[in-house]
Design a protein with these regions (language model features):
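Aromatic-capped interface at the extracytoplasmic side
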Residues: 1-12
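Peptidoglycan glycan-strand catalytic modules in the bacterial/periplasmic cell-wall system
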Residues: 12-15, 19-217, 222-270, 282, ...
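Residue-level preference for non-acidic, small/hydrophobic
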Residues: 23, 52, 96, 134, ...
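Active-site-adjacent helix/loop patches that line small-molecule binding or acyl-intermediate pockets
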Residues: 91-92, 100-102, 107, 111, ...
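Structural recognition of the beta-strand scaffold that forms the well-ordered cores
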Residues: 93-95, 173, 418-419, 428-430, ...
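Extended, non-catalytic substrate-recognition/exosite surfaces adjacent to catalytic cores, especially
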Residues: 182-467, 471-487, 493-494, 506, ...
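Soluble, non-transmembrane domains of envelope/secretory-pathway proteins that act on or interact
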Residues: 340-351, 355, 423, 482, ...
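Single conserved hydrophobic/aromatic residue that forms the stacking wall/gate
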Residues: 737, 742-747
């Protein structure tokens, strides 16, 4: 018998809900058997209440926990007359007491002993709670299968609606499951469930809740479901929800728990633990009883900055373009022995990469833990078996070896995309890859890749901060610098326009010209460039301050790049990504609110100059494809492509949105062999464009295609113009001198 305290405060486990900024439920966090979301009595449809009472306990309003008439009838018909369809004698309150306090019985005798205890509990529940509260508790507690625990989750899972919107026939279907959810599972047994639904409708007619005509018309209807599988790998914003889960449940970093190669992560986690109130929120905050919040059982409400419409547009853009791009990639690699890897690798190198992937797989770890030898594991990986695999035409069944499946998945190109408001920091869309179910590594905030020419705006910003202007002229010729090892470094240049002529700095950035970039690097300090990149919010400590840094060999995440670019349309103020605005408890009490983090990283003057140059990238330079694909808005941007087309980037912004996209293979040696499809303007830019066309076309979002950047009246970016023509050969930079002036960076 449970103590009085437990009866007065039954222990419910409620799932945490994640909401979009526009009020849509993105998903839940729960244990597999406790995906329950609380709903109050006033938010229940009268149809579900009427169906439940008519079917399970028609005298619910009259008894005090035990229905003597129903109990006597059941005993006589079943115990004496041996009738199988005698009807149940348990009231709704008794059934609730069983759900709350009776474990599953192993045999008939054990179940018989449980019954009297349930009667006593039922009477006490009636004493402590109103009838409405008992009905609410019952419907919140019941397990409707398919990971749909509680009426709110069930209504969404089976009919795609809220409990208050359940139609009569839908409510009857769910109540019909209460007799035996497995037997009357509408997903598996549609006709059987329909028959049970019709029994419930007949009971509702007998109880006077519906007329005979209503019953007949409703019974004639087919059982139609709008089935929504409740799975954290399915639905909208899957990568974002998983990222957010990790942030909310993070523990205080302990260096002993990080391996040597994880020191960068330890560094970032330590910074976040001290400075980010959302990081480890469940660990840092406690409830009234002193215990820490549990993301999976405390029924929290997480209100995020994502807009469900913009998120859908972003996911659609990634899907549409990757599907098309993948066809070109398959065609290029068809017949190549080392595919999907580049021909530049030896077969031994390819085998080593695939072998490493095998050793990192779950199958390998499980077999190794079970004591299998390397030979046994190798044999298992080379044995064909039936499996379902991803394809852009939908999941397909096939037969292949696990080793072949590893190589098969390596063929698929990956992507990362993020979009945010440069003024508020609100992240509006977040896509970490092509399909979370199959490709779970997050390339939006977690993964880092070389950024190529998208780093150039940072160098040009450093130049503006040091007295350059967009109109300064430089001779367009090859420049040679001396690197940190004392060796000459001359960057290659794809741009063959105006060779030998005087060109402006603005022209250099618009055309992503490596020679003009090298010239600026020769006049500046690679250590200062590294420092500026960190100031823009990039936290990778492994950035090497070499002269080649100006071409983007360093690895940065999409999220870091998007945040960094907010400074350009935002008058020099960088805004950190904001993912959550507030957290509430199950009763709607606000537990925490979150505000954007802002930092002035460059002067307003430099921001204006960069804005002018980045607009030229789109209107006059390498980003011109944006215009041809239909985006007419006032905007700036930058393309990026790394060596051998391993990474394709596009960063773009309007006055109200900054968005960035990366596309590439899982491994750097998986890439297009030609620039036709391998450059950033072909791999990443179309995703950005598809997204923006959809966003600007949806007037309900409030983004105006005619919005323009606000520059001072009569602004002239060339007013500080001076002629800085220099030599075509730059003498060695004194690295000893530079290191002496480098200071430790504190983020």
């Amino acid at each position: 018998m449970p103590p009085v305290e437990d009866l007065e405060n039954p222990n419910y486990k409620f799932a945490t809900e994640v909401f979009s900024e526009d009020g849509k439920v993105l998903g839940t966090y729960s244990y597999s058997k406790e995906n329950r979301v609380f709903v109050g009595y006033n938010d229940l449809s009268p149809n579900i209440i009427n169906a439940l009472i008519a079917t399970e306990d028609v005298r619910f309003a009259e008894h005090s926990g035990i229905d003597a008439y129903a109990l006597t009838r059941a005993v006589v018909k079943r115990g004496i007359l041996m009738q199988k369809n005698a009807g149940g004698g348990s009231t709704i309150t008794q059934q609730l007491s069983k759900q709350l306090y009776s474990p599953s019985a192993d045999n008939v005798m054990e179940r018989l002993f449980q019954k009297p205890i349930e009667w006593v509990i039922a009477v006490k529940l009636e004493r402590y709670y109103t009838k409405e509260e008992i009905l609410t508790m019952y419907l919140n507690k019941f397990d409707f299968l398919n990971n749909a625990v509680g009426i709110k989750t069930a209504a969404f899972t089976y009919f795609g609606c809220e409990p208050k919107d359940l139609k009569i026939e839908e409510a009857a279907t769910l109540v019909g499951m209460c007799k035996n959810p497995s037997l009357y599972n509408p997903v598996r047994y549609n006709e059987r469930s329909r028959g049970r639904r019709n029994v419930v409708l007949d009971q509702m007619r007998k109880a006077g809740y519906i007329t005979e005509a209503e019953r007949d018309s409703l019974q004639a209807l087919p059982l139609k479901l709008k089935y929504n599988r409740v799975d954290h790998k399915e639905g909208l914003a899957t990568y974002f929800r998983e990222y957010l889960r990790g942030v909310l449940t993070a523990k205080k970093p302990d260096k002993a728990n990080y391996r040597g190669w994880q020191m960068q992560k330890y560094y970032e986690d330590s910074l976040d633990w001290e400075n980010n109130p959302l990081f480890g929120w469940c660990e840092k905050n406690t409830k009234k009883d002193g215990t820490k919040y549990n993301l999976y059982t405390d029924g929290l409400k997480i209100y995020t900055t994502l807009d469900s419409r913009m998120q859908q547009y972003a996911e659609d853009a990634v899907t549409e373009h990757l599907k098309e791009l993948q066809g070109y990639f398959f065609k290029e690699k068809k017949g190549a022995k080392k595919a999907p890897y580049t021909f530049r690798l030896t077969q031994e190198q390819v085998d080593e990469i695939l072998g490493r992937a095998m050793r990192l797989s779950d199958r390998y770890r499980i077999m190794k833990k079970a004591g299998a030898t390397e030979a046994e594991i190798k044999k298992a990986f080379d044995t064909p078996e039936e499996m379902s695999v991803f394809s852009w035409e939908g999941e397909k069944d096939t037969i292949m070896t696990p080793m072949d499946s590893i190589r098969y998945y390596k063929f698929f190109l990956r992507a990362g995309f993020m979009s945010m408001d440069p003024r508020s920091g609100h992240v509006k869309a977040y896509v970490g890859g092509p399909n979370y179910h199959y490709f779970q590594y997050d390339m939006a905030m977690v993964g880092r890749r070389q950024v190529g020419s998208t780093i150039k705006p940072f160098l040009y910003t450093l130049a503006m901060e040091n007295g350059f202007s967009p109109c300064d002229e430089v001779r367009h010729v090859e420049y040679t610098l001396i690197d940190e090892n004392g060796k000459p470094w001359t960057p290659r240049n794809a741009n063959k326009k105006l060779i030998g002529d005087m060109v402006t700095v603005k022209w250099g950035l618009a055309n992503s010209d490596n020679w003009i970039t090298a010239y600026l690097m020769s006049k500046l300090n690679p250590y200062n460039l590294k420092r500026l990149i960190h100031t823009f919010g990039v936290r990778n400590r492994d950035i090497v301050p070499s002269v080649s840094l100006c071409l983007g060999p360093c690895e940065i995440s999409v999220g870091e790049m998007v945040s960094a670019y907010t400074a350009f349309p935002n008058k020099g103020i960088r805004v950190a990504p904001l993912f959550v605005t507030r957290i509430e408890d199950n009763d709607g009490n606000v537990l925490a609110t979150f505000a954007p983090e802002m930092q002035e990283v460059i002067s307003v003057s430099s921001a204006y100059k960069m804005l002018v140059m980045l607009r030229a990238v789109v209107n006059e330079g390498t980003g011109g494809r944006v215009r041809r694909l239909g985006v007419k808005a006032d905007m700036g941007g930058k393309t990026g492509t790394t060596n051998y087309n391993a990474d394709g980037w596009f960063m773009g912004f309007t006055p109200s949105l900054v968005s960035g996209c990366w596309v590439g293979g899982e491994d750097r040696d998986i890439h297009f062999d030609t620039m036709l499809h391998g450059q950033g303007a072909s791999m990443a830019l179309p995703i950005w464009t598809k997204y923006m066309v959809k966003v600007l076309g949806d007037k309900s979002l409030g983004y105006d295609e005619n919005e323009t950047f606000q520059l001072p009246e009569g602004y002239d970016p060339c007013k500080d113009d001076v002629n800085l023509e220099g030599d075509t050969h730059i003498e060695a930079v004194s690295y000893t001198h530079l290191r002496a002036h480098e200071t430790e960076l504190h983020l």
